[in-house]
Amino acid sequence: DNVTIEHSAIVHGCTIGDNTLIGMGAIVLNGARIGKNCIIGAGALVTQGTDIPDGSLAFGSPAKVIRALTADEIEENHRNAMHYVEIARESLI
């Protein structure tokens, strides 16, 4: 729930936890597991079988965990997802 996958991202055969954002142009490959409350940076490459723990910021190629997200960043992920839900609702009217 509340996952945001930004423009040109590729997600294939992976698991993405709730309230996570996959940045523009990121690639997440088979068997990768992205925990809940994460941000995968724009252009990141999450390789096959990689495990990104809950609450992590990860970027790079290959993607590596840089640090834990702050409470404000986790809340912003949720607000971002809800914004897209609202846009979708408006477009259906």
Set out the residue ranges of the language-model regions.
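A structural motif detector for beta-strand N-caps
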Residues: 1-9, 14, 19-26, 32, ...
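Residue-level preference for alpha-helix termini and adjacent loops
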Residues: 28, 51, 64-68
